[in-house]
């Protein structure tokens, strides 16, 4: 079995593939203060509850945008699984040309998403990934990574509102019925959800104008399901796009 690990700034997503089939996946918090043994035991217990033996994990690949986490997860893989993980980074085979001024600057998760979307859908696409930051990445009809843009994520944008405006409460991410709201909580929810949907639609529209075509627009990431219904541009959600991309990249390097 193949263990894929996608380390984001806020959450870490793990998945186990048996061949091409994703048989289990989990989402845990990214905590750089945790020790090797704390992460090792957490992962061990996740597998145990899913009735997966640690000995069944024969291969591991990691995509990480939080460099200190590699100092934790690499030893975890070697100590608890006796496997040296493959790390997505410079020099790894992606099978995708990267048209970026400095390819080393591109976040591993962005490349992984691009690889997955082209392999899976076989067409040009814009991938919108709702994470700590929200990324917009364009893949050409020839399967080339052409770049994109990065916006503040919906969570950190909202945190700025809660922390900088002392009289405004924290609110849950849910969509109010009306944009012209009648109370403070609903007003904030309207601003956050509809405002962010407008940000997404605006950026996608400008990207399409610059590209001069009409690519598939696909969303992934933890909050995609909250924002997508309020957008006009996102056509579909693929929750497991990043995990699938990691599987593909591992295959191309094995």
Swiss-Prot record:
Active site: 109 (proton acceptor)
Binding sites annotated in the UniProt record for substrate: 100, 107-110, 184
Recorded catalytic activity of this chain's protein: (R)-pantothenate + ATP = (R)-4'-phosphopantothenate + ADP + H(+)
Listed GO MF terms: ATP binding; metal ion binding; pantothenate kinase activity
Recorded metabolic or biological pathway in which this protein acts: Cofactor biosynthesis; coenzyme A biosynthesis; CoA from (R)-pantothenate: step 1/5
UniProtKB keywords: ATP-binding, Coenzyme A biosynthesis, Cytoplasm, Kinase, Metal-binding, Nucleotide-binding, Potassium, Transferase
Cofactor(s) the record lists: NH4(+); K(+)
Residues holding ATP: 6-13, 132
Domain of life: Bacteria
Annotated residues for binding of K(+): 129
Any one GO cellular component localisation term in the record: cytoplasm
Cofactor binding, per record: A monovalent cation. Ammonium or potassium.
Documented EC number(s): 2.7.1.33
Localization of this protein: Cytoplasm
Listed InterPro entries: ATPase_NBD (IPR043129), Type_III_PanK (IPR004619)
Annotated GO biological process: coenzyme A biosynthetic process
Pfam families, per the entry: Pan_kinase
Gene3D superfamilies: 3.30.420.40
Function: Catalyzes the phosphorylation of pantothenate (Pan), the first step in CoA biosynthesis.
NCBIfam families: baf, PRK13318.1-6, PRK13321.1
Subunit organization: Homodimer.
HAMAP family, A to Z: Pantothen_kinase_3 (MF_01274)
Similarity section: Belongs to the type III pantothenate kinase family.
Protein name stated in the entry: Type III pantothenate kinase
Taxonomic lineage of the native organism: Bacteria, Pseudomonadati, Thermodesulfobacteriota, Syntrophia, Syntrophales
């Amino acid at each position: 079995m193949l263990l894929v690990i996608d380390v984001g700034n806020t959450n870490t997503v793990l998945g186990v593939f048996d061949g091409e089939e994703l048989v289990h996946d989990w989402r845990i918090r990214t905590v750089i203060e945790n020790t090797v043994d704390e992460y090792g035991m957490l992962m061990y217990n996740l597998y145990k509850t899913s009735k997966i033996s640690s000995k069944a994990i024969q291969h591991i690949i990691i995509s990480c945008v939080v460099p200190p986490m590699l100092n934790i997860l690499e030893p975890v893989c070697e100590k608890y699984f006796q496997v040296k993980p493959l790390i997505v980074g410079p020099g790894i085979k992606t099978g995708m040309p990267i048209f970026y001024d400095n390819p080393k600057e591109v976040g591993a998760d962005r490349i992984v998403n691009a690889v997955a979307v082209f392999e899976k859908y076989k067409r040009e696409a814009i991938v919108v990934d709702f994470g700590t930051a929200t990324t917009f990445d364009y893949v050409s009809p020839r399967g080339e990574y052409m770049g994109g843009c990065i916006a503040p994520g919906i969570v950190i944008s909202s945190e700025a509102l809660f922390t900088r405006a002392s009289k405004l409460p924290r609110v849950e991410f849910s969509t109010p019925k009306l944009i012209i709201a009648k109370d403070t909580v609903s007003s904030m929810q309207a601003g956050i959800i509809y405002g962010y949907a407008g940000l997404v639609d605006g950026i996608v529209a400008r990207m399409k104008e610059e590209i001069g075509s009409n690519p598939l627009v696909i969303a992934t990431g933890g909050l995609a399901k909250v924002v997508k219904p309020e957008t006009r541009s996102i056509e579909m959600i693929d929750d497991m796009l990043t995990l699938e991309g990691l599987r593909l990249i591992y295959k191309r390097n094995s």
